[in-house]
Amino acid sequence: LGRYSVDQPLYPRSGSNVSMSLQFTAPYSLFGNKDYENMASSDKFKWIEYHKYRFTAEWYQRIKGNLILKLASKHGYLAYYNAKLQSPFERFQVGGDGLSGFTIYGRDIIAQRGYEIYSNNDGATIFNKYQAELRYPFSLNPSSTIYGLAFFEAGNAWDNFKSFNPFQLRRSV
């Protein structure tokens, strides 16, 4: 579900991009009486089950001329139908530059400049990321759009709501 009102895809000057995605799998563990605590991992994760929620909001505003302010907020939450079946797949990894453009081992990589991708090796089930950028174009040629930017990012990932602290953020400038 989303709303996209950005004026240009390569160098947005105004508009917003707001989206929410939901992913659900069937709750296989509810269909049988199995002892998941003593089960081998290969049997336990034969059928992965989870429900995953992501929210992204980006706003673009022209300050003066081609100087643009971008504000963004991203959030994610991964939950399980059965607490004994917390899969190592589909988790969130916060860090890296975001240039890889793909998911490794069923994990969503949430780019945050200045931090390594695997600073949280097991992945996390909750993440928040906030971003502010000032952008100025050097070339608006559609075949080679080039712009400089100054940015501020803050974000983190947590394993559960007990450890979740929205004010404990890793920052980069």
Predicted regions span which residues?
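Intrinsically disordered, low-complexity linker/loop segments enriched in Gly/Pro
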Residues: 5-6, 15
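C-terminal transmembrane beta-barrel domains of outer membrane proteins
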Residues: 14-173
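Extracytoplasmic assembly/pore-lining segments of large envelope/extracellular complexes
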Residues: 10-12
